[in-house]
Amino acid sequence: MEHRIAAPEPRIRAERILVIQFRQIGDVLLSTPVLRALRSAYPQSYIAFLTEPSPGRVLQSNPLLDEVIIRPRHATWHQQWQLLRHIRRKRFELVIDLIGNPRSAVLTCLSGARHRLAFARFPRSLFYTMLVPHHHPVPEYTVAKRLRLLEPLGIRATDLTPILPYTQCEQDTVAAFLRAHAITPKELLVCIDPTHHVPTRQWPGGHFSALVDMLRERLGARVLLLWGPGEEAQVQAIAAAARSHPVLIPEWDLHTLAALLAQADFFIGCNSAPLHIAVSQGIPTLTIMGATCSVNWLPPEPQHRAVLADLPCQPCEKNFCGPPLNMACLRTLTVETVFAAVQACAPWIAKLQRLSPSV
């Protein structure tokens, strides 16, 4: 289906636009559809994005942007002052604050921009000139919510797909890796992201090991385990506990990871950045949900599904869970339940429909 901007003529003229989003890699990746909508509505404008060092990697080589401005995560007063001077020199006419936290609100207010747009959160609402209700009558996908922020500009966008491009060189790197491990295009290739730094989003490692074996033994799948900075030892332990010898990917950057996921048939994982990268590459996904709300983090299309224990306390949106529950939402979610959810995704995985299990 072709997606279009419903209102191509923006209500506000702006030749210089700044978008602000801090925090995690996934937060910035899920903001890229906003850039697509802005570039469609403002094809000749100068568009910049203000973020932090780690998530800023998502925006490398993004063709929709003219500039990526990096704010150090723990900026000193001098660095804050230098950043503000740089922003004011750019003479932005429109600032869109997607995160709306105290730091971004102050920067937006002091940017010198005439038009300052954000979600309404009192008292920070006082720093902006245009506000959109923060709460929606029904739960909504995070990307849809951020696109809703553009409606005061007369922009109504419907394309929810995140953007993470990769080069031919990165594609060649992935192809060489797959050849080295004798993974052929005919095989069912499943990428699993088995880690999360927040305990209430982390399915037990032993469960992942058992799932890897089940995928190999019952479906004949080739399984690759994904990992990021500080996660290698944890993922190595998961691989060592599996009988089927899953392969760990190398220490790749985000764009090479995107090139890999573009070649995969299916993604399984926790609610973290690799999920959103998989979505950006158009492959079906299954997300193991603990404390978070699946509606907020999954696209509405049926090929992106969640599996959860469905306890009364879900979703609690908490980062920790002590007695008496002790993260029961993840502990009690069985490997068989998750495998059944994988099988339910067969309508969107062509190879899963025709491959016979191999033991």
Where are these predicted regions, by residue range?
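Catalytic machinery of carbohydrate-active enzymes
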Residues: 1-359
